[in-house]
């Protein structure tokens, strides 16, 4: 996510990071105007889900799959509002998409669940979705809750 933060930072945008403390890797990137560090994955995932208006997933490892699965499940079950969910990189996400299609074929999920997300290489789709939603003006009180949670 450093590249996205870098671009926004360069044009004077607010860049907020939700970092997790791990035994290896996962350091905040230098382009954040604000960073919240969490000890526990569940607290980070809840915070990410509460703060987001659009979800954009790039190729990643188990953590990425964990976060994506959580968002898909919460969306499918109606536990959070439907929001645009983009998986960037068709070559990478093709197999994942096939697994989801197989789940629908086997009636393990509804056919409509296949449409919860969009696999694309077209970043303009993401920009258009974000622009439709607009840039929410989130009060500082909203982030105060994250500050408190990240200090636990």
PLM regions with names:
Residues 1-6, 93-104:
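Glycine-rich, charge-decorated loop segments at or immediately adjacent to ligand/cofactor-binding or catalytic sites
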Residues 1-57:
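Acidic/glycine-enriched connector segments
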Residues 35-41, 115-126:
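Short acidic-hydrophobic, aromatic-tinged amphipathic segments that line or gate anion-handling sites
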Residues 99-117:
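N-terminal glycine-rich dinucleotide-binding loop that anchors FAD/FMN and/or NAD(P) in oxidoreductases
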Residues 2, 66, 94, 127-128:
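Alpha-helical elements of the RecA-like P-loop NTPase motor core of helicases
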Residues 14-22, 58, 72-98, 111-112:
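Short, acidic/small-residue loops that bind anionic groups at enzyme active sites
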Residues 119-152:
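SAM-dependent methyltransferases
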Residues 39-88, 134-142:
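Active-site/ligand-binding-proximal alpha/beta "capping" segment
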């Amino acid at each position: 996510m450093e590249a996205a933060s870098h671009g926004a930072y360069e044009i004077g945008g607010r860049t907020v990071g939700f970092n997790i403390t791990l035994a290896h890797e996962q350091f905040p990137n230098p382009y954040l105007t604000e960073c919240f560090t969490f000890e526990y994955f569940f607290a980070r995932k809840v915070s990410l889900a509460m703060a987001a208006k659009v979800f954009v997933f790039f190729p990643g490892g188990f953590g990425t799959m964990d976060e994506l699965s959580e968002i898909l499940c919460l969306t499918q079950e109606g536990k959070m509002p439907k929001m645009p969910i983009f998986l960037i990189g068709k070559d990478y996400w093709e197999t994942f998409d096939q697994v989801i299609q197989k789940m629908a074929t086997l009636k393990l999920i509804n056919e409509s669940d296949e449409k919860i997300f969009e696999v694309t290489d077209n970043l303009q789709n993401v920009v258009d979705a974000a622009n439709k939603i607009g840039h929410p003006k989130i009060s500082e009180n909203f982030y105060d809750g994250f500050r408190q949670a990240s200090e636990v």
